[in-house]
């Protein structure tokens, strides 16, 4: 019989190489075939609910790393909650209307103008659903557990119907109105934009100072005086109708190089330098309020501009006198409204100057800038022209600049319930905490929400018009449209005549002939997703309204967090969410946004194909996503290495429990050895820490806690010396069964704790354990156990670990000095102080075995440590080469090798084990 046959060398089919890219697909098929999501929901019936409401990603293209971070984070939370006492359904969603779909069709060569609107919208629908299905497969491949067969999609009939009802409820309460106001307008999209659809980029703009001649100075200013204004948008000068001043500021009339001007007193020195004035004399000082209703000659046209008061005027830039074009600026509009200034807009939907800008009509607004400048220079009104770089709003889809343009639009006003929204924000928990202040300030300061869009693909605004132009929005018309949308989808709005869309027999005093028309604009996509609290949370029996949690990127403070909060408080008088987690963006290694044009993208699909979805998921768990996250391929390599350690450690425990039946072989805690008890106490501390971290949505701490436990306490300590027990002792010997009890408990608990993060790997490990649940996802999270005397036990073993660290340092020194090679070649003598001597004497374990040395002597306190011993705090350590021969079975150097004549190659311990457990070896003898 060979010596190897007497060793309990763990054997397992659990592969060392993960092969995740292929093996994960098999697991996912098994989950689908066994309806695992539905099984988990059924198991959790009757438990307290926890609803994480999925903010809908836009359905366009394959998922990117930001999607992976977001959806995996949600999945980790939902999986944990589902295994920890909650009914936690997860309904995924998609945002499917809007300009990107139209742009995608245009790229495919589909021309909107060459077909009916209904046919075009059907193409948009088909394309959007293709994108939904693409992303659904991407998310499923990532291992996301969800109700994939019943997602919510903003283009479905049931969703659109509920969105109409949200709009109707807001209209009934008086929050919806039509007005002509300057709004963000994208000439490249030919549509209005909400604030959430704006991004800022640096551009170069003109900086221009223009003189307006005083016409009526109200007996304060002479007619030969000039007001000086500053602007960065020369093209809006044709739309100028006023000059705004701050009533509280001091202004001065000055004589500068022979010409009289008016500027703010505090800006005089700056203007003197800027305009190069050499001789400046202050003639008068007065308040801005004194200039109210003065008039000035427009520098280009034969009309007057009115001097008005406005608190928006500041002294940070410019002259303290603000060029006011009510059709092209929000502050201009608000200030001008008080003086009944007309709302004059001088560009059309494409950004082309109109006939309201004589001399510039037919010119693109940006091209009009130099033309306006030239005209002002010719008539002597241009005082100074420079150029500067500044941050300017752009269309987030087309990346082109936007302008302010007054058009007739539909708005949602929040003034009537702004305080109610702010009060609701105070009740919401935000992670990070600064999110509360950010959203609070946004709502406090935001203006009215422009909800109409001049596009084709979206939910129609359910508004009718009478023959006399009266707008018709009544509870009856809203409900009729909602029912029609629920039955036919929103295309019915474009397929049917207005009278057929109205309730049967509907009449209106403004339509004596019974004729009606319908609104052509569609709703802002943020109104779509912003209605999900009614269309999804309130509409589905398995969900709850409000949701317990939402989790999205930090850009959603001005997006979905904002729009859903407004609509929810408007119709339900409550925040749609109880807690908010915001995450940063995924950036490249240099902190740049990932984009195809920069060539710096890392796609989840690539990582999954190369390394597996569990590697992407482990990366998600390893990062602090509360701020922006930089990622490189090296990060995934590092995570892959950490994964390998997890896998190999779990494999070792599986391999060494193949002959362990937990039902028969588990040893009660009270009967375990001290070190085994210590490891179970530590395991329960790990369980407690991980569950607390999961509860706090702190996945990085879960990852670090498990990783440190596996690396420092299991691999580097317990499993390291355990080999001398589980391999060498007899199969049923108590020390071996003690250790197997610990191995198995650790394997089961860690597998459960890892399931939310590594579901594929956890299922693979679980299939090698002897647990009643077929899938670990159907098991419950481990409970935290506490044991009598555990605090003293931990204190004892922590103290021992300090001594062990000292011994390891001494062994390393001996290795470097060529005294020993491996630690098993060492004979160690310890010279402990009184406390450490008592500690070592109290241990019921073989200290030599714990230290993985062949020979150990603990000297009496009376014995003084030799000079060559390494001195530590509380113990001195002396290392020599062990005396004796190497046992061919346990590999220790012993002086009793050959003491049993039957086994001359074995030490006395191994000879006794073989004699007791392998009679054939006794009969036949042993060979190497």
From Swiss-Prot:
Predominant subcellular localization, coarse grouping: cytoplasm
Q: What is this protein called?
A: Isoleucine--tRNA ligase
**GO biological processes:** isoleucyl-tRNA aminoacylation
Q: Which UniProt keywords apply?
A: Aminoacyl-tRNA synthetase, ATP-binding, Cytoplasm, Ligase, Metal-binding, Nucleotide-binding, Protein biosynthesis, Zinc
Reactions accelerated catalytically: tRNA(Ile) + L-isoleucine + ATP = L-isoleucyl-tRNA(Ile) + AMP + diphosphate
Q: Which Pfam families does the record cross-reference, listed alphabetically?
A: Anticodon_1, tRNA-synt_1, zf-FPG_IleRS
Q: What does the function comment of this entry state?
A: Catalyzes the attachment of isoleucine to tRNA(Ile). As IleRS can inadvertently accommodate and process structurally similar amino acids such as valine, to avoid such errors it has two additional distinct tRNA(Ile)-dependent editing activities. One activity is designated as 'pretransfer' editing and involves the hydrolysis of activated Val-AMP. The other activity is designated 'posttransfer' editing and involves deacylation of mischarged Val-tRNA(Ile).
Give EC number(s), comma-separated.
6.1.1.5
In the record, the note on similarity to other proteins reads: Belongs to the class-I aminoacyl-tRNA synthetase family. IleS type 1 subfamily.
Could you describe the subunit structure of this protein?
A: Monomer.
Where does the motif 'HIGH' region lie? 57-67
Taxonomic superkingdom: Bacteria
As to how many cofactors bind and how, the note says:
Binds 1 zinc ion per subunit.
Q: Where in the cell is it found?
A: Cytoplasm
Residues annotated for Zn(2+) binding in this entry:
887, 890, 907, 910
- Domain commentary: IleRS has two distinct active sites: one for aminoacylation and one for editing. The misactivated valine is translocated from the active site to the editing site, which sterically excludes the correctly activated isoleucine. The single editing site contains two valyl binding pockets, one specific for each substrate (Val-AMP or Val-tRNA(Ile)).
What does the entry list as the binding residues for L-isoleucyl-5'-AMP?
552
Q: Which cofactor does it need?
A: Zn(2+)
One Gene Ontology molecular-function label: tRNA binding
Asked if the keyword Cytoplasm belongs to this entry, the reply reads: yes
Q: Which GO terms describe its cellular component?
A: cytosol
Where does this chain carry the motif 'KMSKS' region?
A: 593-597
Q: Where does ATP bind?
A: 596
Which HAMAP family is this protein grouped with?
A: Ile_tRNA_synth_type1 (MF_02002)
